[in-house]
From Swiss-Prot:
Substrate binds at T61, D136, E196, K226, D230. May play a key role in the regulation of the intracellular concentration of adenosylhomocysteine. The keyword Cytoplasm applies. It is an enzyme of class 3 (hydrolase). Binds 1 NAD(+) per subunit. This is Adenosylhomocysteinase. Keywords: Cytoplasm, Hydrolase, NAD, One-carbon metabolism. Its EC number is 3.13.2.1. It catalyses: S-adenosyl-L-homocysteine + H2O = L-homocysteine + adenosine. GO terms for cellular component: cytosol. It comes from Cupriavidus taiwanensis (strain DSM 17343 / BCRC 17206 / CCUG 44338 / CIP 107171 / LMG 19424 / R1).
Amino acid sequence: MNAVTDLKQDYLVADINLAGWGRKEIAIAETEMPGLMAIRDEFAAAQPLKGARIAGSLHMTIQTAVLIETLKALGADVRWASCNIFSTQDHAAAAIAAGGTPVFAFKGESLKEYWDFTHRIFDWADGGTPNMILDDGGDATLLLHLGARAEKDQSVIANPGSEEETFLFAAIKEKLAKDPSWYSRNLAAIRGVTEETTTGVHRLYQMAQKGELRFPAINVNDSVTKSKFDNLYGCRESLVDGIKRATDVMIAGKIAVVAGYGDVGKGSAQALRALSAQVWVTEIDPICALQAAMEGYRVVTMDYAAEHGDIFVTCTGNYHVITHEHMAKMKDQAIVCNIGHFDNEIDIASIEKYEWDEIKPQVDHVKFPDGKKLIILAKGRLVNLGCATGHPSYVMSSSFANQTIAQIELWQERDSGKYPVGVYTLPKHLDEKVARLQLRKLNAQLTELTDQQAAYIGVKKEGPYKADHYRY
């Protein structure tokens, strides 16, 4: 790895010479992202993000490059880091850096580098601060809030509970020693955040409930055209892509255990069953468990599944769904991976003491005391981005169109009082707009209501067509 490390240079990527390759793939991705490109075309002249200085923390992929260039086309200034140490596509990062956007990301970052890079998206070259955050997983939002609390009371960063927190707390202490008011100064300047994923949304709601959230947030994840498409259809294609690239394993006939049957779990289970795996599901929620059972999946506990499964996939957004005890029961050569945002769904920390043998990047054999070996993918982090390239461009177009619309909404309404501190979702008509834009690529033909039909069901002919509480 020959990352650029000159701090006078306002980017840090693996190899800037990869920019040409990245640019070619970005051009292809644009043809597969109709919703996002239509938003770019619609708003470019109006420049609705003029004056916005966006600190972005989201997987630095080819698709994200199209998002970044859309935000810039609409008037924003942008700085970017990846939200995962393994998810960056180095040619995408190089292309964005070569185009003049400060980006700090390369595949295989250390945790120290990760938190250093997350800090750098807030350090504008002119000495100013950002005024918006675009987040995935909530780390950028967490950093400012936790750092501001630590300015007043460093006991909040005194006792790390994980390896991740060890590096985060150390990074905050280092920054406070250099600039004691850095966090509160940046926090005060932020006018809003748009959050991409389930895990980050959970954090936002927790902060809001505790009265800790300091600026308005739009929950992009729960837009229907995000969660029911990215989370479900995206995972349906990218999960097995990651497993196959990493292991070349035959999935047919094997017992695949999917932990969690939300949208991500549903897509993951469909993908594995499509390749003729015997799919078992673990769930805590009786409604989701019933859905899984009605789809023909066997619903079991992880305690039971551990000794039977061949492939394990966590999809919960929760903590220690697969424990050391579970892994100790597993078969020799069982494959263990995660497609939730953070690496603590699997208790990776408990097996770090064992012998790890790297088979290839992000694929490790972990030898247990009894001699058996488990195949751990992406060290428990996102398997579809660590071992493959994530979701296809088309489905990310829906997600990133929502992100762009949410950034416009918060920025345009920053002084109107429409969004006091809290967590919001985009209105239904914007969700439907994204779907309409995406349909163009598929040559779909929508039926139009007649006046009589619209009156009969009590909606406008142009929509929205469903109540906010409708479950798609």
